[in-house]
């Protein structure tokens, strides 16, 4: 028997990115967990079904957070720029996740709060720790949210307690994938997660491409967030024409490996065109870009180019998992960007 759920209220949604569709006092019909249709008048065939009537309340689609890396230290250390912030705040916190009990407590809070937010889908970072990342996936699966979760890879330029051996990092990723397959999650999917180019050697990226091909999983990472970071990538990868080219060199930049890249604040013309050609998704994280003084991503340009752009809370660089707050920051950043261009 089909599982039918009917909501009544003022329904707002979008068929295209340029216009809202509004159905006042309409009916949203879900069949077996998927939207079957939106109706101004309920079809006769559904007349006997129960209706959840929300009166004059708005009914909107659940939101997708394209970049949610950490949580417990959200909104702290905002007097620092990216690289110093990672060393001072992020890495010491992530090292604690070696302790599965600590991870369990932290991830339980994260999953609970995410469920009570406007987000229904998210791309989430774990840490390098395989068991703790599985704990994160367990909590998110129980929440009912639809998520992609990654075990992070780092084999250079990171503290001793967070630096994996190159072979170890690749092998742990394979073992993690086997664990995920064994658990048979319904709503929680794996996503390959090299933290960013400075923390991953060429050898590791080459191995991770083999993992990606073997399991046909998507990729998430960071791109052109900070000017110092970009200069560092130039030193580490002299063969790369631009930051994104370093990922693309190993087949981890869209095309046959669906990819989400966070930030993209300083993407060059060549990088933008490669993202467009390869179908790379941009995770726009306006609050953390402000908090860490990274800059303002040219999102209007990306949309005009036809790139796929979504919002990221980027907790803990952002202060909250609330994507309504991210929307407000995106609007302010967009206004500033346009005014800077005019002047």
Which residues does each PLM region occupy?
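C-terminal helical cap
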Residues: 9-13, 107-114, 119, 281, ...
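His/Asp/Glu-enriched, well-ordered alpha-helical/loop segment
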Residues: 10-11, 242-245, 249-255, 300-343
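Divalent metal-coordination and catalytic microenvironments
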Residues: 10, 28, 33, 56, ...
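N-terminal metal-binding scaffold of metallo-dependent hydrolase/deaminase domains
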Residues: 1-46, 57-59
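Metal-coordinating catalytic core of metallo-dependent amide/deamination hydrolases
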Residues: 135-265
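Histidine/acidic-residue-rich catalytic or RNA/ligand-binding cores of hydrolases
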Residues: 76, 227-239, 272-275, 293-302, ...
